[in-house]
Amino acid sequence: MLRTKDLIWTLFFLGTAVSLQVDIVPSQGEISVGESKFFLCQVAGDAKDKDISWFSPNGEKLSPNQQRISVVWNDDDSSTLTIYNANIDDAGIYKCVVTAEDGTQSEATVNVKIFQKLMFKNAPTPQEFKEGEDAVIVCDVVSSLPPTIIWKHKGRDVILKKDVRFIVLSNNYLQIRGIKKTDEGTYRCEGRILARGEINFKDIQVIVNVPPTVQARQSIVNATANLGQSVTLVCDADGFPEPTMSWTKDGEPIENEEEDDEKHIFSDDSSELTIRNVDKNDEAEYVCIAENKAGEQDASIHLKVFAKPKITYVENQTAMELEEQVTLTCEASGDPIPSITWRTSTRNISSEEKTLDGHMVVRSHARVSSLTLKSIQYTDAGEYICTASNTIGQDSQSMYLEFQYAPKLQGPVAVYTWEGNQVNITCEVFAYPSATISWFRDGQLLPSSNYSNIKIYNTPSASYLEVTPDSENDFGNYNCTAVNRIGQESLEFILVQADTPSSPSIDRVEPYSSTAQVQFDEPEATGGVPILKYKAEWKSLGEESWHFKWYDAKEANMEGIVTIMGLKPETRYSVRLAALNGKGLGEISAATEFKTQPVREPSAPKLEGQMGEDGNSIKVNLIKQDDGGSPIRHYLVKYRALASEWKPEIRLPSGSDHVMLKSLDWNAEYEVYVVAENQQGKSKAAHFVFRTSAQPTAIPANGSPTAGLSTGAIVGILIVIFVLLLVVMDITCYFLNKCGLLMCIAVNLCGKAGPGAKGKDMEEGKAAFSKDESKEPIVEVRTEEERTPNHDGGKHTEPNETTPLTEPELPADTTATVEDMLPSVTTVTTNSDTITETFATAQNSPTSETTTLTSSIAPPATTVPDSNSVPAGQATPSKGVTASSSSPASAPKVAPLVDLSDTPTSAPSASNLSSTVLANQGAVLSPSTPASAGETSKAPPASKASPAPTPTPAGAASPLAAVAAPATDAPQAKQEAPSTKGPDPEPTQPGTVKNPPEAATAPASPKSKAATTNPSQGEDLKMDEGNFKTPDIDLAKDVFAALGSPRPATGASGQASELAPSPADSAVPPAPAKTEKGPVETKSEPPESEAKPAPTEVKTVPNDATQTKENESKA
């Protein structure tokens, strides 16, 4: 058992040592076509000098170092077989043979399998197709085993779409029948080999090209030549890819690359072709061609170029008398072919015209027309106009037919006139060449010495023989003879003695109440000269004289009626007619009797309409007819559009001659009825029908400027007008009442004083006024409101409605009246010594706005009364006023100041000015020249101050209203103003009022210093463009200094005494007397008494004062 085992191992080792073992790694080989792979042949054994060889499947030994199938001997025990880029033919069993040194061989084999991997041999992308064709998408798949092909689109199997248009062909191509643009996209060709689980795919982009479509916007385009026009031809093309455009003209390409081609201009995409300066040569058929990959298409546009007609040929012609015919020719060009017409200066000749005798024949063919005149007459000569017309326009040319003929004479053969009446015998001459004209009488050439009353006037077309018959011998035959080189012609004229016309015949008379219409026939014989007028005579039965009236013959002959007016109703009349010509009044007709109708209703007026220029208004004229013997009271007019309601009736005065109907409906028919009415009743209605114009589409040139404004524009205009009215009102309030927005701005921004400040000054009895920022006088107004009971125990009489507002002016030359009449104006009137100034009163004054300032300036005088003064006892009190004596206890009432700030002050005259106190005026103010303001004046010292005045009650009349205070015992003082110097010294009366004897014997007082022109004692404040003085200013001093008047004396208390009233109205005009002075209230005067100039008081005459007390008068 043991020996057997050992024997086996011994045999094994012996066998191994003798034979070699060959192995190939890898033992199996699969290669895809195109891939490379190597195999290693290894030998195991101790044999030396072995030979390793490789054999191909066909048994051929593979030589080493080949390029595609390479064999490399690595060492004694191994060798490598490498197959590069294997193909199907390389498949098979490869054998590795090892040969030992003793010749024994050992081998090993490897089965090399080569398979075709899934490959897309023919599957291009993109693949393009034409829309509508059957598209086949190519996809060739190469594989060792037959693959399964699946087509997908948008991730889905196209077969599963159940679209019969999609078919997979036997060669695995995909067919799409009638491919659409919507089928465009990416298609996936996917191949699968189930045995190997191999899969591969290829995405193919499918593009569907759409053949171009092109359409001309206009197949026919019209243009007009030679007008500098441009025309654009447009083609709209569509397709995919976007087609390119090209153009041809009558088959010839129009190049788009010529930069210097100013005739043709292309758009960026060449879809538009613009032809500039179109002329006739541009007329052609233009083709636009659209082309892309899918094909091409074209469209045609026919450019039709029209041309205005143009006359290309005309020729003047000359013809002789007795020639048979002449032809005028006219040629014209144009497109469309123009039609040619003929006309002369007086008539149109139709293209088909042919007179009965064949005198004119018109023939036309294409562009040529001819006018043939047969049996030519001299009247055929002249201008012939050839006109060529088509739808584009027209052209005309003139040609002239010159006809040479003997003279032809025309004119009225019988000419009527009378002795002493100048008349012209007219001999009209038609001749070519021009003829020489001569006049003969009884074979004698005119003019001649035997016929001094004959004159001849020649014109190119006629000769006039002016004859003024002196006797019967001048009447008879006159011969006119014309001669030219063709021949001559003569014509006899007869100058006939004219006669008066025969009588017209009255057919019938149509009487009415106050008129009658006489219908007549014209005279049978006019006497050879025209009838100028008709004379109608009529009278009532029993009257001896005839009434008559002349009627123009032209108007009367139109209707054969004359109307007699102004007749009496129900009265019998006789009427007769006569005609008047240049010779004289003709026979009068037989009288015809008629009787007027009784008083009745009037006849309907005659209506005539005249449409307005706007088209929807009418002026209906009313022509008065018979009034029925009673004056017409009025006319009643009513109108309406047909089938509409009547408009409200219109009543017109009897004197109306028309009625205007406006704002009528457009294009509507209206009817108008007019009835005349007198005391007897209404007439029949006169009826008038008219139609308005159609509403215009455009605004007429003479239409209303706002007719075409929109609602917004009208509202805007109204707003602007409203704002302007507010501005005007504000400015008015500023200047009149010192209020409003403008005043607020002036107060807050410009520092002006407001109306409240001015009112405060008014309450204090002060006022300031200024103009152009200059200092002006401040006027203090004094009024006397109450009369003291000791003035003769009388009371002031209340004026009634019969009391005059102003007293009669005294005839003295020294009266100056100043009245304020709005608007603010300063008027200085110098009449002898009279000065009148007008100021604007304060806006806040409760009185009216009229102030009368009367000043009296007394000349230097002694204490002796003026010899011309009238004693107080002679003065007669004015009506309604009780004379009373002044009392020292009574004091004038200080009224609020008059604001004259808005009134420009004009300087009075430099001449001597003097004034006297008006009758029944309590005080006077004496204005003077500004130059005298700086002068000083002296006056006697004043007496003691009077008691303080009593304040005015709230319910009293306006404090500016002057109270008439006449006095019968106070003489007036006369005062004279110097011309160039300041006021001279003058006498003054004591402060207390004295009776007339005392006033006459009062001694003169020492003189005092007058006020200067700058009396301001306080700070100047700007107000209303002037200087406002502080309340501590001596107002009276300022006023009199500015006016150049002496200042009145004041008492110790600074209050002026009462002034002596002026004399009342008297039968004898009073002479100027000395004026008694009263103290003037001031705040800055010292207590001691000073001599002051004569006082001046202001009388305000209000326009409308409120009467509250018995002692207050109406202004």
Curated annotation (Swiss-Prot):
The residue spans the entry assigns to the Cytoplasmic side of the membrane are as follows 730-1115
Q: Which residues carry this modification: Phosphothreonine?
A: 929, 1001, 1030
- What does the subunit comment say? Interacts with MDK. Found in a complex with SLC39A6, SLC39A10 and with NCAM1; this complex controls NCAM1 phosphorylation and integration into focal adhesion complexes during epithelial-tomesenchymal transition. Interacts with synaptic plasticity regulator PANTS.
Q: Name one GO cellular component term.
A: external side of plasma membrane
**What protein name applies here?**
Neural cell adhesion molecule 1
Q: Which residues form the Ig-like C2-type domain?
A: 20-111, 116-205, 212-302, 309-402, 407-492
Q: Where is this region: Disordered?
A: 756-809, 839-912, 924-1115
**Function according to Swiss-Prot or TrEMBL:** This protein is a cell adhesion molecule involved in neuron-neuron adhesion, neurite fasciculation, outgrowth of neurites, etc.
Modified sites of kind Phosphoserine? 770, 774, 887, 890, 926, 946, 958, 1005
Q: Which residues form the Fibronectin type-III domain?
A: 500-599, 601-696
Superkingdom in the source lineage: Eukaryota
Keyword annotations from UniProtKB, A to Z: Cell adhesion, Cell membrane, Disulfide bond, Glycoprotein, GPI-anchor, Heparin-binding, Immunoglobulin domain, Lipoprotein, Membrane, Phosphoprotein, Repeat, Signal, Transmembrane, Transmembrane helix
Quote the biased-composition stretches of kind Polar residues, using this chain's numbering: 902-912, 926-935
Organism in which the protein naturally occurs: Mus musculus (Mouse)
Spell out the Pfam families in the cross-references.
fn3, I-set, Ig_3
**Claim: Membrane is one of the keywords in the record:** yes
Q: How is it modified after translation?
A: Polysialylated by ST8SIA2 and ST8SIA4. Polysialylation modulates cell interactions by confering both attractive and repulsive properties that are highly regulated by ST8SIA2 and ST8SIA4. Polysialylation is formed on a-2,3-linked sialic acid of core glycans.
Q: Which amino acids does the record list as binding heparin? A: 152-156, 161-165
Please give a single GO biological process term from the UniProt record: cell surface receptor signaling pathway
GO function terms (MF aspect): heparin binding
Compositional bias ranges of the Low complexity kind: 800-809, 845-856, 876-896, 936-974, 999-1012
Q: List the disulfide bonds.
A: 41-96, 139-189, 235-288, 330-386, 427-480
Transmembrane spans: 712-729
SUPFAM superfamilies, per database record? Fibronectin type III, Immunoglobulin
